Structures are given as C-alpha cells and as structure tokens.
Amino acid sequence: MRLLHVTQSYYPFLAKGGPTVKVRSLARGLASSGNAVTVLTADLGFDRAKREISGAVPGRWGFEASENGVEAIYLRTRGRYRSLTWNPGVAAFCPERLDGFDLTHIYGLYDLIGPRVASACRRIARPYVVEPMGMFLPIVRNIWMKRLYHDTLGGRLLQGASRVIATSEQERLELLEGGIADSKIVVRRNGIEIPGQFPPAESFRNQWNIPRDAKFVLFLGRLVSKKSPDLMLEVFSQWNRRENGSRGSVLVMAGPDEGDGFRQHLEGLAAQMGLNGRVLFTGPLYGDAKWAAYRDADVFVLPSQNENFGNTAAEAVACGTPVLVTDRCGIAPMVDQRAGLVVPHDCAALEAGLAQILNDAALAARLREGCKGVANSLSWAEPLAQMETLYRELISERRGQ
C-alpha cells in the first residue's frame, strides 16, 4: 500500500508531546511490513532536524528526510501562532503527489495542513481516516477558537473521513456525543516502543541527587493545564503535610513547557507551598534519561483532566513502576488494580491514592508485579495489524472489490 500520514508535528520535534512519537512508531512499523509510507508535516526547525536526522536535506516544499524506510516531507513554515503553523506548500503538494497514494491517515485537529489534505482527498475520491488524538473535545485554552475550528474546518474534516480512530472507549464515547456516527468509529489502542535495554537502576537518582531511600514521585509530560501539573503540586504538598514532611520525599516535574510562562507559574506555586528542595523541574527528558526516570520512580502520576490514552503511563508500566491515573485517562481500565490505581480528578482522591501506593509496601509490590502482564499487552504489533487491515478494507471499498 502507498500511504500518506499527515501530522502537524513529527520527529525530531519531541517537545510537541506523545503524538510525535506515536506517528513515527506507526509509520516505521507500517514501512517495515512492506508499505510505502510518506509523512507530511510542518518544518519546525531545519537546523535542529539536520543535526538529528541523518540525510535531512532541503527540498522543494521545505526539507525532506528518509528514516527506516519512511519518507518525511517537512513543509516550509511561513507563519506561526503557538502550535498552529501556516504551510502554503501544502497547496502545491496535494495536486502533485496526492494521487499517488492509496489512502491518507490524518492525525490531530486544530491545524491547517490536515483539513487542506482532506479537502483534496475528497475531490479525487481518495479515502482518508482521521485520528483526533484526544483533541476532539475543546477542554482548555482558546476554547472559542477551537469551537470555531469545528464549525468551519473540523466539521468537514471529520464528516468526510471514511473512519475516525479512537484510542480508547473513553474517546469513542466523546466522539459519539459529538455527533460522529458509531459505524464510522474504530477503536485502536496505542502501543509503546520499549528500549532493548533500560538504563542502570538508580542512574536518575544519582544524577539528580535523590537519596536511595527517598520517596520519588514522578510527573512526566508537557507542562500544560490539560495535564494538571498544578494539581500535582497540590496533591504532593498535601501528602507531605499528612506525612509530616516525609523525609527526603521528592516530586520530579519533567517535561517541556510552551514558552508561555506556565513553568514559572508552577515554580512559584511550589515555593508558596513550601516545597523548595522537594520539587525538581528537570525540563524535558528524552531517550535514556526518560527511561531512567521511570525506572527509578516509586510511583508515576498522571493527573490529567482528559487523556485519550496516556502513553506516559504506559511507558512507566513498561518499566515496572506503579501508576496513579485519573478516571479521565483512556488507559485507566487497562491499569486499574493491575499496574496502578484509578481515582477521580480531584485533590483528595489523588492524595489518598498516592498515600496508598507510597505507604503500603505490599500493594506497591503487587502493582509492580502486575506491570509485567500489562506491559506485555502494550506492544505496537496488534495496533499495526489492525491499521493494515482497516486500510486494505477502505482501499478495496473504493475500488469496488
């Protein structure tokens, strides 16, 4: 199959979060099984990309690269507002290249590339699928702009799709409530790529001077309001007070911010709560540094307002670390009472769950053991096979076979 994957952000721009990693994993997996895969995305910085991608070269529409059998085309960015980019090269790409693909997979909402490609697909009767990646519900920041997007570009994008991909039952219900037909929705979980070898135990603790006997709580993700890092601080503060300042306990807040001052706001909150020396803001962690943090933590917490899946929780589980997630995370049913605890999205419930995992050694040991079984069900093999089957079905429908 000749497949086009369209995404606002792609490797090596990892600061844009989990979608960047997910699209790369899917593209590489599909290419490894013999499909011709092209990724169309935005150029968010050629200088950085050429340092991290072997063979990245200037191209007609921006720059191009080939990695693990995947052709990546980074459209030149002519304007930008937050994560939204203007990439006029998509107008030339579509008439010249789109007819050469059997199917297009569009990731995410609230960008301008996906709707333009979808419109071109409809004109030439090419099937496309849309994977909202948890963006369907406008929850935080610029909500009125997101609603305007749905009323204009987003509505046509989704209604014209052959299928809409949800990564959890939670996201499927959100799509149904938003008017997407049940017959159009396909549920496909995410997978994770686990390194062949983890960093040595205690390497993260040693690097950041976290004592071996200290309770190490990990929050890892973008520092944005949707993921509730401010609530994480409040939960940790309350747990510390309840434990009378548990000796040496540390909260690591790892992840990029969006340059909007939110990290500074969080640092100020930590100081107001008297957590100086107890909270470490490490910035983003990638590669071995990320896996070392997961491995050394006593518990990983994902206190999000809404997560279509929760890749970071899955990665923590793969490292054998118990997780505490809210019931608004798509991964919750997979981990509940097996690899972690699931609680409502409020401070008291999260603090109680944190106390359970940190204070009950038998529970923590049971959850660590349970992580093994959950981790075995989180590879990309099944999701990739499901996508290939779906793609072939839609291509056959178009050809009338």
Regions found by a protein language model. Give the residues of each.
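Aromatic "clamp/platform" in nucleotide-sugar-dependent glycosyltransferases that forms part
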Residues: Q305
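Carbohydrate-associated surface elements
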Residues: D43, Q170, G191
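Nucleotide-sugar donor phosphate/pyrophosphate-binding loop at the beta->alpha transition
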Residues: P127, L137-G160
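Conserved acidic donor-binding segment of nucleotide-sugar-dependent glycosyltransferases
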Residues: Q337, L341-A348, Q356-A362
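Conserved donor-binding/catalytic core segment of Leloir-type glycosyltransferases
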Residues: L4, P211-K227, L233-F236, V252
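A short helix/loop element that forms part of the nucleotide-sugar donor recognition site in Leloir-type
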Residues: I53-W61, Q197-I210, R241
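Glycosyltransferase donor-sugar binding loop
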Residues: F46, I192, L220, G248-E267, ...
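Short hydrophobic beta-strand element within catalytic cores of glycosyltransferases
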Residues: P322-V325
